[in-house]
Amino acid sequence: RNVTGVQTCALPIYNFIKNLSLDLKGNTLVLFSRVETHGAILYEKINNNKGEDRKVFFIHGGVDTEERELVREITEKENSAIIVASYGTFSTGINIKNLHNVIFASPSKSRIRNLQSIGRVLRKGKDKVKATLYDISDDCATKSKRNYTLNHFIERIKIYNEENFNYEIVTIQLKNDGNRR
């Protein structure tokens, strides 16, 4: 582990997610599992590299309901907002019609959680013609540890097959050489 407590293997993945979220067109929801070790890091990386006119929000269990509702209302009127949110706060019960992309930034194998999370981007919007899910997984296994991220990804692929989702698996070789931006 490095000084901030982030696994070295995770650094290029965080940078990839940062770059992906900043490059996507439309409003994007980045879902994470753990506030301190995932969400706060992703939010900081994205927010520190965004354009001046781009809105980036950080939502987790410590954010009150009124602020979450305000973020939802703002996002409905935006074209390029990024919401970095915990699964617990934004995977269910949030209705944002003007949401174009969802990024699964943390592993989960829960069928209900995954389908509910995908449902966030499937809401029909006024000018929305496409909804895209980016399901991020890594293969950072070590000899002494199982790679739960990859195992959970395999479980999600089974769900996508059962639900007849169209998907493409893209392998990207990441380098641990810092930030693109």
Protein language model annotation of sequence segments:
Residues 29-63, 67-70:
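Conserved helicase motor "Helicase C" RecA-like lobe of SF1/SF2 P-loop NTPases
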Residues 10, 14, 18-45, 160:
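Conserved strand-helix element at the start of the C-terminal RecA-like helicase core
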Residues 2-5, 9:
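Single conserved hydrophobic/aromatic residue that forms the stacking wall/gate
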Residues 56-58, 133, 167-169:
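Conserved beta-strand scaffold positions in the cores of enzyme catalytic domains, especially
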Residues 27, 55, 129-132:
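Residues at the starts of beta-strands that form the adenosine-phosphate
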Residues 60-163:
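Conserved RecA-like P-loop NTPase helicase motor core
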Residues 25-26, 53-54, 79-80, 99:
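Short, high-confidence coil segments that cap the C-terminus of an alpha-helix
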Residues 13, 27, 165-181:
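Long, largely alpha-helical accessory region at the distal end of helicase-like NTP-driven motors
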